[in-house]
UniProtKB/Swiss-Prot annotation:
Gene that produces this protein: rpoB
Record lineage: Bacteria, Pseudomonadati, Pseudomonadota, Gammaproteobacteria, Pseudomonadales
Protein name, per record: DNA-directed RNA polymerase subunit beta
Catalytic activity: RNA(n) + a ribonucleoside 5'-triphosphate = RNA(n+1) + diphosphate
Subunit structure, interactors included: The RNAP catalytic core consists of 2 alpha, 1 beta, 1 beta' and 1 omega subunit. When a sigma factor is associated with the core the holoenzyme is formed, which can initiate transcription.
Domain of life of the organism encoding this protein: Bacteria
GO biological process: DNA-templated transcription
Enzyme class, spelled out: transferase
Family of this protein: Belongs to the RNA polymerase beta chain family.
Lipid metabolism keyword on record: no
Single Gene Ontology MF annotation: DNA-directed RNA polymerase activity
Record key words, sorted: DNA-directed RNA polymerase, Nucleotidyltransferase, Transcription, Transferase
PROSITE patterns for the chain: RNA_POL_BETA
């Protein structure tokens, strides 16, 4: 394989044994593809597919007026250009969006004509609000903050059959039910009650007999019975009663008479149970008629009404039970044929027949009225109203939609072959659902598993945005209908009819405040990616935490390869919020699919198919790690497989599919944990979750022991700068990279230059620091897709969340008791876990009733010293180091005029004293914060004069833009002249500056000319002259284009900012805070091994090895066995080997060994100890040297999950590094120099510093605010609150009998207002006594008791 620019600089030793059949897909595809389909940006009218915005418009339009004389049709839409780019939106706090313009056509029909002749057509583009755009990393910028829309896992539309698991009725009888769930519209439930009648509920309202619904659909009793039952036909001839025999129906019954064949031979004796053998004999004998006694009919149900042959009068209605009296009437009327329902107790119960018996309605109208009463209780029903209501419930496309998914699931479940059909229900649909339900009750068929991923689908961003958009459009539709009637008479245009506010409001509400629109977790690249790949069962139309039971949260066999079984939050959301598996994707119906390799006759092919949970059920699927021979055939006699959602073993020839990769089971975060296979699942869960909380360190450090997924995550997360096109690095500095694009990648008319501006010290959503550092040097050749700059937590294009620390597992003076961590001072000195946090502080100047607030350096009653960090505009300098209480932005607010004494008035008149009528409301640094000002932004309202600071910031930004554009022009111009030089040198000239006719042009001549003079040359070859003219035109066009671009940017910068009403100016100050690691900070490994730093010891006191190398961290070995995360020990061993190999390479470099020796040693590391072979021969000597230099700190290893390094390989690596194979060494106590009594496990573990810093939690209150009602101090760090002295603490003091301390706690230290002030006065006077009074909260209690109407008085002595 060819290595990329960064890969060949540092190759990871890969221990995987299985080949890569398929690359890991782009990890953000689920977000980007979904929203791309929703917008269909760039599609022409003909190319629009029936999805997304287009589908939403088509479902609501055309809108026809109430009279039918005017209609508004939808033609198409187009998206405009965004006003600001992403970075500008974040700065200005606006939404990154594009205007949506819809072309609609207003048609007015001629009222007089009979055939609706068209009288007038008007077409117009209407503005329909703004649609947020997705950034290239799958996020949205809403009001300046980056947000993610999480995908939702919800119950798929369709029909589901279930039972109550015996919970409803005390007998434990299973009550079956069916539920038709549409995509939008009313739910329809059918359910059995304990008496085996079928009921129907609409939208979970009160139940009605199911036959009411069938009657309302227009079925008569007889048609209903015909649909559900077969009939037995009896012929009456005089005194004999003959049954038309269907032998199968007799099975299981007891013969009430002897059953004989045609010859009179008895087949079944009276009183015997009829078995399958008897039935076979009857079929062979060809018995078609069976004589039965008349009482055989008693208790049977009539299937067709019995009519008097002579008079035509109805003797018995259908669905009536036959009794003796009825039989007598039948005999008297000489009826010759009776049809009864065939029912039995085993597999054909009389459920529908029983339901009809309890049904009080007898015709369609009564049934419709009954349904109307249930849906609209209290309203008087009319025939029309009842019909309209029922028609709208399930049969109107506007109110009811199963959607394509719903129809597909519906048809599949009830056994139809076609998967497409209408979105509304039909009579047949309802009958078929009832038939299936009755079959399941009869024991034919099974109920559905609601947690099966074939019954749950994923709703992505695009689909949810489309639904919201439709909601907005439906609101618009109502208003448009009202106005259309006016349009006929008043000649309105489409623009006057459509008010886009409801649409804009619906979209804004969805992106701004929906439960699934979340503030992006931007701690580090992994947390971003995981957030975008999250799948939540909560949210609108989903579950709620309280109602979700264990089953929904549990891991289901169908999760395999679709949803990660490991990564989910701990706590109330466990199992409801999941993460997509590495290779999973959604299909067109929204079901999750996983890829598999096709296996034919035990030969594994490279053909890959994606299957959903339903499609894979019948396949026999082998694991990715199944043993294959050289030809790719399965060799084991029995292969471990998955079949019908069970794990089992099968012969190789039965296998039909095979997993693509061992990591397809887990999510991205879990696939980053090396030796995951050796960790307990609970700890792996914590490990996956804690990696997302790692704070990016000052200098990222790649993990020595990784899994090979680090590069994918860093590349796909979007925090690195990736080359859009290949080329040569023209210039590079800390803030940008300029690439001169290779000629073969430049398309005509495009500039052959790419400028990448790097993000420097920017604040993330979590206040961590986003900073990019270039990796390339001037003159380097890069290809498309190479990584040009590292972002936060990335090191040479690999994810690097923490630091490699030398750890020893040993108890140490109790400092690492219970997961505490003992750190060496060296870690702090080397800034290994130093992180930068950026805080944004905002100062807003408003227009108040008494006058405008002013931002100024002239602040009353403030000394010079406090102002020395402010400029003349009153804003702090960039680079100032500030601490708590320092003024960042000086601001004064006018305060109300006070009554002045005559003397004051006189002084005021003489000295022009103005200071007393404003108060100081400056922005100060909050308590507990100290840092450096790294940036200031000033936003000024239109029409308000800009201050000097705002103007200087604007000038700086313009200079930067101008610099970029000049650079671009310089490169384009340079490339053009290079091409011209190649064409001109050696060609003959006709004329030119200081040139004779016919002279050959040389390099020296061209160098002597100014570039503008080149175009004055006249060549003998006309093609060359044409080339010169084209080049001149091209250069001037580019210049013009860039000037226009500059003017556009300048206009944007100089226009006023769109601020909230009443706001004149906003100043944002950004503080960078450096946080070193300190006791109380939380740290963790990748295996769920978390702990808190308890002590930082001097280096000389730490345990060290025989060479004197001290360890960085001492961990407690007791944290391993009970937690069963042995992965951390294996990681430590392999880390030791990796570091040892690096040191060996370092020694070779220091001894200046030959490159061949180095190459040989690298070959030993990479290609002789298991795992994947690396092709080192394609690297030149210089590249080998560069690689060796990068490996000095340790040879990075990859041990992919479920396919990682084996114990023997770790030992071999340790041996190669000349280290003990046990991974243990003798350590010495740094304080005494004595050797510890047994060898200790020492190695390198990758440790993370989590975003739970003691600085953010530690807090102490001095004098602060009090609660208004209880007069007690507030609680919490944010309110500068006190410590709660709670109920249990009071008990403790009571138990000790510390009465005075307790009294002090409950009165003067809390809410005794008078006592507090008195105590303050006493202390000032040097008197340290206290007098306790009445606590305020006691007065509140008395007031509350009085409010209950109980008079309570305190007796005074």
């Amino acid at each position: 394989m060819a290595y990329s620019y960064t890969e060949k600089k540092r190759i990871r030793k890969d221990f995987s044994k299985l080949p890569d059949v398929m690359d890991v897909p782009y990890l953000l595809a689920i977000q980007l593809d979904s929203y791309r389909e929703f917008l269909q940006a760039g599609a022409t009218k003909e190319q629009f597919r029936d999805i997304g915005l287009h589908a939403a418009f088509k479902s609501v339009f055309p809108i026809i007026s109430y009279s039918g004389n005017a209609a508004l049709e939808y033609v198409g839409y187009r998206l405009g250009e965004p006003a600001f780019d992403v970075k500008e939106c974040v700065l200005r706090g606006v939404t990154f969006a594009v205007p949506l313009r819809v072309k609609v056509r207003l048609i007015i029909f001629d009222r007089e004509s009979s055939n609706k002749a068209i009288k007038d057509i008007k077409e117009q583009e209407v503005y329909m609000g703004e649609i947020p755009l997705m950034t290239e990393n799958g996020t949205f910028i809403i009001n300046g903050t980056e947000r993610v829309i999480v995908s939702q896992l919800h119950r798929s539309p369709g029909v589901f059959f279930d039972h109550d698991r015996g919970k409803t009725h005390s007998s434990g009888k299973l009550l079956y039910s069916a539920r038709i769930i549409p995509y939008r519209g009313s739910w329809l439930d059918f359910e059995f009650d304990p008496k085996d009648c079928v009921f129907v509920r609409i939208d979970r309202r009160r139940k009605l007999p199911a036959s009411v619904l069938l009657r309302a659909l227009g079925y008569s009793t007889e048609e209903i019975l015909n649909a559900f039952y077969a009939t037995n036909v009896f012929h009456i001839k005089g005194e004999t009663l003959n049954l038309e025999l269907v032998p199968q129906r007799l099975r299981g019954e007891v013969a009430s008479i002897d059953i004989k064949d045609g010859s009179g031979k008895v087949i079944v004796e009276q009183g015997r149970r009829i078995t399958a053998r008897h039935i076979n004999q009857l079929e062979k004998a060809g018995v078609t008629q069976l004589e039965v006694p008349f009482d055989y009919l008693i208790g049977r149900t009539i299937a067709k009404a019995i009519v008097h042959p002579a008079t035509g009068e109805i003797i018995a209605e259908c669905n009536t039970e036959l009794t003796l009296d009825l039989l007598a009437k039948v005999a008297k009327a000489q009826v010759v044929r009776i049809e009864t329902l065939y029912t039995n107790d085993i597999d054909c119960g009389p459920f529908i027949s029983d339901t009809l018996k309890i049904d009080n309605t007898s015709n369609q109208l009564e049934a419709l009225v009954e349904i109307y009463r249930m849906m609209r209780p209290g309203e008087p029903p009319t025939k029309e109203a009842a019909e309209t209501l029922f028609g709208n419930l399930f049969f109107s496309a506007e109110r009811y939609d199963l959607s394509a998914v719903g129809r597909m699931k519906f048809n599949r479940r009830i056994g139809r072959t076609e998967i497409e059909g209408p979105g509304v229900l039909s009579k047949e649909d309802i009958i078929d659902v009832l038939k299936t339900l009755v079959d399941i009750r009869n024991g034919k068929g099974i109920v559905d598993d609601i947690d099966h991923l074939g019954n749950r689908r994923v709703r992505c961003v695009g689909e949810m945005a489309e639904n919201q958009f439709r909601v907005g459009l439906v609101r618009v539709e109502r208003a448009v209908k009202e106005r259309l009637s006016m349009a006929e008479s008043e000649g309105l245009m489409p623009q006057d009819l459509i008010n886009a506010k409801p649409v804009a409001a619906a979209i804004k509400e969805f992106f701004g405040s929906s439960q699934l629109s979340q503030f992006m977790d931007q701690n580090n690249p992994l947390s971003e990616i995981t957030h975008k790949r999250r799948v939540s069962a909560l949210g609108p139309g989903g579950l709620t935490r309280e109602r979700a039971g264990f089953e929904v949260r549990d891991v289901h066999p169908t999760h395999y390869g679709r949803v990660c079984p490991i990564e989910t939050p701990e706590g109330p959301n466990i199992g409801l919020i999941n993460s997509l598996a590495t290779y999973a994707r959604t299909n067109k119906y929204g079901f999750l699919e996983s890829p598999y390799r096709v296996v034919k006759d035990s030969l594994v092919t490279d053909e890959i198919v994606f299957l959903s949970a339903i499609e894979e059920a019948d396949h026999v699927i082998a694991q990715a790690s199944a043993t294959l021979n050289e030809k790719g055939q399965l060799v084991d006699e029995l292969v471990a497989v998955r079949h019908l959602n069970e794990f089992t073993v099968k012969a190789p020839e039965d296998v039909t599919l095979m997993d693509v990769s061992p990591k397809q089971v887990v999510s991205v975060a879990a696939s980053l944990i090396p030796f995951l296979e050796h960790d307990d699942a609970n700890r792996a869960l914590m490990g996956s979750n804690m990696q997302r909380q790692a704070v990016p360190t000052l200098r990222a450090d790649k993990p020595l022991v990784g899994t090979g997924m680090e590069r994918n995550v860093a590349r796909d997360s979007g925090v690195c700068v990736v080359a859009r096109r290949g080329g040569v690095i023209d210039s590079v500095d800390a803030s940008r990279v300029v690439v001169r694009v290779a000629d073969d990648e430049v398309e005509t008319g495009e500039a052959g230059v790419d400028i990448y501006n790097l993000t420097k010290y920017t604040r993330s959503n979590q206040n961590t620091c986003i900073n990019q550092r270039p990796l390339v040097s001037k003159g380097d050749v890069v290809a498309r897709g190479d990584i040009l700059a590292d972002g936060p937590s990335t090191d040479m294009g690999e994810l690097a969340l923490g630091q490699n620390m030398r750890v020893a597992f040993m108890p140490w003076n109790g400092f690492n008791f219970e997961d505490s961590i003992c750190l060496s001072e060296r870690v702090v000195q080397e800034d290994r876990f130093t992180t930068i946090h950026i805080q944004e502080l905002t100062c807003v100047a408003r227009d108040t009733k008494l006058g405008p607030e002013e931002i100024t350096a002239d602040i009353p009653n403030v000394g010079e010293a406090a102002l020395n960090k402010l400029d003349e505009a009153g804003i702090v300098y960039v680079g100032a180091e500030v601490q708590a209480g320092d003024i960042l932005v000086g601001k004064v607010t006018p305060k109300g005029e006070t009554q002045l004494t005559p003397e004051e008035k006189l002084l005021r008149a003489i000295f022009g004293e103005k200071a007393s009528d404003v108060k100081d409301t400056s922005l100060r640094v909050p308590t507990g914060t100290k840092g450096t000002v790294i940036d200031v932004q000033v936003f000024t309202r239109d029409g308000v004069e800009r201050d000097s600071r705002a103007l200087s910031i604007e000038k700086m930004q313009l200079d930067q833009i101008r610099k970029d554009l000049n650079e671009e022009f310089r490169i384009v111009e340079g490339a053009t002249f290079e091409r011209l030089r190649a064409a001109l040198v050696g060609a003959k000239a006709e004329g030119g500056p200081a040139l004779k006719k016919g002279t050959e042009i040389t390099d020296d001549y061209l160098d002597g000319l100014e570039r503008g003079q080149w175009f004055k040359l006249r060549m003998a070859d006309d093609a060359l002259n044409e080339q010169l003219e084209k080049a001149q035109a091209y250069i001037s066009d580019r210049r013009q284009l860039l000037d226009d671009k500059f003017e556009d940017k300048k206009r944007k910068l100089q226009q006023g900012d769109d601020l909230a009403p009443g706001v004149l100016k906003i100043v944002k100050v950004y503080l960078a805070i450096k946080r070193r690691i300190q006791p109380g900070d939380k740290m963790a490994g990748r295996h769920g091994n978390k702990g808190v730093v308890s002590v930082i010891m001097p280096v000389e006191d730490m345990p060290h090895d025989a060479n004197g190398t001290p360890v960085d961290i001492v961990l407690n070995p007791l944290g391993v066995p009970s937690r069963m995360n042995v992965g951390q020990i294996l990681e430590t061993h392999l880390g030791l080997a990796a570091k040892g190999l690096g040191e060996k390479i370092n020694r070779m470099l220091e001894e200046q060994r030959k490159v061949a020796e180095l190459r040989k040693f690298l070959h030993e590391i990479y290609n002789e100890i298991g795992g994947r072979e690396e092709n080192l021969d394609e690297l030149g000597d210089n590249e080998i040297l560069a690689l060796a230099k990068n490996l000095r700190g340790g040879v990075p290893m990859a041990t992919p999950v479920f396919d990682g390094a084996k114990e023997r390989e770790i030992k071999a690596m340790l041996k190669l590094a000349d280290l003990p194979e046990s991974g243990q060494m003798r350590l010495f106590d740094g304080r005494t120099g004595n050797q510890f009594e047994r060898p200790t496990t020492v190695g390198y573990m990758y440790m993370l510093k989590l975003n739970h810093l003691v600085d953010d939690k530690m807090h102490a209150r001095s004098t602060g605010s009090y609660s208004l009602v209880t007069q007690q101090p507030l609680g919490g760090k944010a309110q500068f609150g006190g410590q709660r002295f709670g109920e249990m603490e009071v008990w403790a003091l009571e138990a000790y009998g510390a009465a005075y301390t307790l009294q002090e706690m409950l009165t003067v230290k809390s809410d005794d207002v008078n006592g507090r002030t008195k105590m303050y006065k006493n202390i000032v006077d040097g008197d340290h006594r206290m007098e306790a009074g009445m606590p305020e909260s006691f007065n509140v209690l008395i007031k509350e008791i009085r409010s209950l109407g109980i008079d309570i008085e305190l007796e005074t002595e």
